[in-house]
Amino acid sequence: MAMQMQLEANADTSVEEESFGPQPISRLEQCGINANDVKKLEEAGFHTVEAVAYAPKKELINIKGISEAKADKILTEAAKLVPMGFTTATEFHQRRSEIIQITTGSKELDKLLQGGIETGSITEMFGEFRTGKTQICHTLAVTCQLPIDRGGGEGKAMYIDTEGTFRPERLLAVAERYGLSGSDVLDNVAYARGFNTDHQTQLLYQASAMMVESRYALLIVDSATALYRTDYSGRGELSARQMHLARFLRMLLRLADEFGVAVVITNQVVAQVDGAAMFAADPKKPIGGNIIAHASTTRLYLRKGRGETRICKIYDSPCLPEAEAMFAINADGVGDAKD
């Protein structure tokens, strides 16, 4: 009898575990969707039920072999499996309180961010060269693997590098600082080099497939905008560039929603050279315009301080006050500035 109760309890927990996190696309087959249609969805880059539920109907109709009637049926079934309706602010507040935050390696910076880099949203870091953007990314790629009680995310990291600045030896130095095995840390980081804007977007489809297979806590794109500056030039291509960038950022946001990963992107700055620049306190502004400004949940502005110190300012956030914190770039990653 006790054995039977134990088995029932185990069955309950497995059902509960299934209801949390993304559901594999194969679940749609149990809802009466043709296996061939599910395969077509998977080939088009939809690996979870959530991905289908969040997609506009137009996107499904564009898939070869999916008619409007089929798209309607697929979306109806996906909506039954994914809660997408209204909820009370109390429930949402409860969910928000359970959000994991990943430590940056600096206590001052964590205090500024009220715990660290938030999972399930996009954090954008922008600043000139040599302000610590890539160094924070390298440190986060290690700290996201720490246990939750040590400020980690207990998951793997994914690193899309568009500028060729990824250095595994930096990860080893940070791993040593936290007492982690260097080889394990490197095994838990999936790295890809992005060569052009289309390839950069294609990598997100691969990322989605990998996130279904394994638990990832962090997705880094360093830098999200570098390739857009070279692939699209002049004002004539501006609208095409912004549309492509908007699509890329939308996919990032969808990955953050679907898998609850922390998405960290770095952005470059441009100097204002118009007449108004003379009166601006700081004539540098992030590139990507309003599209990237609206897509990022939290925007951090990094600038140089004295020596090895850097200053991080909350540039835009829905819940953090506009404030600054000082941090340092040390041999073992990002840390606190010494007075």
Curated annotation (Swiss-Prot):
Entry binding sites for ATP: G127, E128, F129, R130, T131, G132, K133, T134
Cross-link (Glycyl lysine isopeptide (Lys-Gly) (interchain with G-Cter in ubiquitin)): K58, K64
NCBIfam families, A to Z: PRK04301.1 (NF003301), recomb_RAD51 (TIGR02239)
A biological process term (GO) from this entry: chromosome organization involved in meiotic cell cycle
Modified residues (Phosphotyrosine): Y54
Residues with the Phosphothreonine modification: T13, T309
Organism annotation: Bos taurus (Bovine)
High-level lineage: Eukaryota, Metazoa, Chordata, Craniata, Vertebrata
Subcellular location: Nucleus; Cytoplasm; Cytoplasm, Perinuclear region; Mitochondrion matrix
Record-stated family: Belongs to the RecA family. RAD51 subfamily.
Underlying gene: RAD51
Protein name as it appears in the record: DNA repair protein RAD51 homolog 1
Phosphoprotein in keyword set: yes
